[in-house]
Amino acid sequence: QIVLKVVKDINKQYSIHDFRIVTGPTHTNLIFDVLIPSNDQIKHDLLKEQINEKLQNINPNYQTVMQIEHSFV
């Protein structure tokens, strides 16, 4: 829920899928794919940075492993 809210706060048209959590002794990996509209021109590195920063503000132990995908619809 937290990751989806962060992504939707950036752009309501974005969504996530294939979400997994892997908890370790020093941090928690949040692994997921972000689906963005096919015509969206945001730079993937910038989007990853924005999402990561917002999640680390919520919990500094969160580490993100994400892929950005463009929808085909």
Model-inferred region functions:
Residues 1-73:
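Peripheral (non-transmembrane) domains and long loops of multi-pass membrane proteins
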